[in-house]
């Protein structure tokens, strides 16, 4: 994108969304492909096998990922969004990344594909003190989540929120959806009540 902007001397035409200049978020891919089997995702392991003929994810070397972040941080005041859960390739991959990125002070958005415990969040926060977190359980209802390919519990979601808040997360985004497999109107409305419970507990 940077080359194209310089070549054409035109930044606005390459802006990824309206008002991007006010919030110049940039992304860095941790991997091509995925280990997860989320039924609604076009980038799932199933989709990778059947659409891209990719049998397993190809992970960016963590040192290169850290280098990308530093380069992006030098160009933009906005956050860098690390697309993909750093733990997909295992904890050693995540720790190599944390060592390589140590000292980076810019805003970073990380995402979880499954719950994270306090120990992991302490390692992450030590390396990335200015971090934002995103987690998409999609439903409060474990039955609906299982039908969408997510097998963790509500306790796991709540442990993740607590661990992030206790380690200084700047913002925690939790995403829920409607129109999911096995989801009823009643279940969707119960998700709203679950959100109220979370706000009462963690706000």
Which residues make up each language-model segment?
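Glycine-rich beta-alpha loop elements in corrinoid/cobalamin-binding modules
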Residues: 1-4
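Metabolite-binding pocket within alpha/beta catalytic cores that recognizes anionic/polar moieties
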Residues: 175
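Structural recognition of alpha->loop->beta junctions
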Residues: 127-135, 194-203
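Radical SAM [4Fe-4S] cluster-binding motif and immediate context
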Residues: 6-170, 178
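Catalytic cores of alpha/beta
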Residues: 182-196
């Amino acid at each position: 994108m940077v080359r194209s902007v310089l070549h054409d001397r035109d930044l606005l035409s390459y802006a990824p969304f309206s008002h991007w200049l006010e919030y110049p978020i940039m992304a860095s891919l941790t991997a091509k492909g995925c280990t997860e089997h989320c039924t609604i995702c076009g980038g799932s392991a199933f989709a990778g096998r059947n659409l891209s003929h990719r049998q397993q994810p190809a992970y960016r070397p963590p040192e290169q990922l850290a280098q990308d972040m530093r380069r992006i941080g030098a160009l933009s005041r906005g956050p860098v969004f690390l697309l993909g859960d750093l733990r997909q390739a295992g904890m050693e991959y995540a720790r190599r990344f944390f060592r390589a990125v140590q000292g980076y002070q810019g805003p970073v958005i990380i995402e979880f594909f499954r719950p994270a415990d306090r120990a992991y969040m302490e390692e992450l926060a030590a390396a990335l003190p200015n971090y934002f977190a995103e987690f998409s359980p999609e439903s409060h209802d474990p039955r609906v989540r299982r039908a969408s390919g997510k097998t963790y519990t509500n306790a796991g979601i709540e442990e993740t929120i607590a661990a992030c808040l206790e380690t200084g997360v700047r913002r925690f985004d939790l995403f829920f959806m409607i129109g999911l497999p096995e989801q009823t109107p009643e279940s969707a409305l119960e998700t709203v009540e679950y959100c109220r419970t979370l706000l009462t507990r963690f706000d």
